[in-house]
């Protein structure tokens, strides 16, 4: 009996040893690539253009949804906890409103500037109208392509720090990508220079085009200022209509991630048509126009220039 017991004990020990080895091998295999999490589809696309297949990438806020206020899913919590590197926009986008990102990284025991980084670091911040204090920043810095280039450089820097063996790969992709963005930026500046001053105003639902306005010399007007406040009230619509009566703006625009009904009301009451949907807080679904940061910006720039030249 002792002999049988000894054999059984040896068998069990060997079995657990094999399982442990198998688990270890599987774990190592799955962790060969850097695990990266981004808060939204725009950051995910910029990251993908630099990192390619060298990383495992998870984006939290789904395409077409508003990143200002979001409730992370269990899968988001799991991926964030497992992440080697996390990129968020910053400038009060994910940390304003219901502060969903602040709670997420705290619960995942992640440390700022060690595990998670603001892609917007180094951007010249623009504030909401009449404000100039922390918590009142306009977060939509990526709508200026020069800032998109800053995002890309920040993302590449942290990828290289975490994964130095792929440094050359990341740097090569960064150079090609930023050159592409820079070329589009220059084309846009030229296009907007040729629009008559009396027509040059971009009118949107959310007042998210301040960075765009500064970069391309196109003043902006809006129904509400930021998506974390009340949206599309009669008073907000009335204020915009009064402003439009003093202009010769030929076209209105509505963002892909907001309720279009308030802008339809503005269009009806002002007799100014909605020319196109444009992208702000999200890229488009895969396979559609605007399904990358570059293509969404190209779409925006072309549609806005075309609409204002009517």
Curated annotation (Swiss-Prot):
Its main location: membrane. One of its GO terms (cellular component) is plasma membrane. Pfam families: ZnuA. Mn(2+) binds at residues 68, 140, 206, 281. Residues 1-20 form the signal peptide. It is a lipid-anchor. InterPro entries: AdhesinB, Bact_metal-bind_prot9, Lipoprotein_PsaA-like, ZnuA-like. Coiled coil: none annotated. CDD domains: PsaA (cd01137). This is Manganese ABC transporter substrate-binding lipoprotein PsaA. The gene is psaA.
């Amino acid at each position: 009996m002792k002999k049988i017991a000894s054999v059984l004990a040896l068998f069990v020990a060997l079995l657990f040893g094999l399982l442990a080895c198998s688990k270890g091998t599987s774990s190592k295999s799955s962790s060969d690539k850097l695990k990266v999490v981004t808060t939204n589809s725009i950051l995910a696309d910029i990251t993908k253009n630099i990192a390619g297949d060298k990383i495992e990438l998870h984006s939290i806020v789904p395409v077409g949804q508003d990143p200002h206020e979001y409730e992370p899913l269990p899968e988001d919590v799991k991926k964030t906890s497992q992440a080697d590197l996390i990129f968020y926009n910053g400038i009060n986008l994910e940390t304003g409103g219901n502060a969903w990102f602040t709670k997420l990284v705290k619960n995942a025991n992640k440390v700022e500037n060690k595990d998670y980084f603001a892609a917007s670091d180094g951007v010249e911040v623009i504030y909401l109208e009449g404000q100039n204090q922390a918590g009142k920043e306009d977060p939509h810095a990526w709508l200026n392509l020069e800032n998109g280039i800053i995002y890309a450089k920040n993302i590449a820097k942290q990828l290289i720090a975490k994964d130095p063996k792929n440094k050359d790969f990341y740097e090569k992709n960064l150079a090609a990508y930023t050159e592409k963005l820079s070329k589009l930026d220059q084309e846009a500046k030229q296009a907007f220079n040729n629009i008559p001053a009396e027509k040059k105003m971009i009118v949107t639902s959310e007042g998210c085009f301040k960075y765009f306005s500064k970069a391309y010399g196109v003043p902006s007007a809006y129904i509400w200022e930021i998506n974390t406040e009340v949206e599309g009230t009669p008073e907000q619509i009335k204020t915009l209509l009064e402003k439009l009566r003093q202009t010769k703006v030929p076209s209105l625009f509505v963002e892909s991630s907001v309720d279009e009904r308030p802008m339809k009301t503005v269009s009806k009451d002002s007799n100014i048509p909605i020319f196109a949907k444009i992208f702000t807080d999200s890229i488009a679904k895969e396979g559609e126009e605007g399904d990358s940061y570059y293509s969404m910006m190209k779409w925006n720039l072309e549609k806005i220039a075309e609409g204002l030249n009517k």
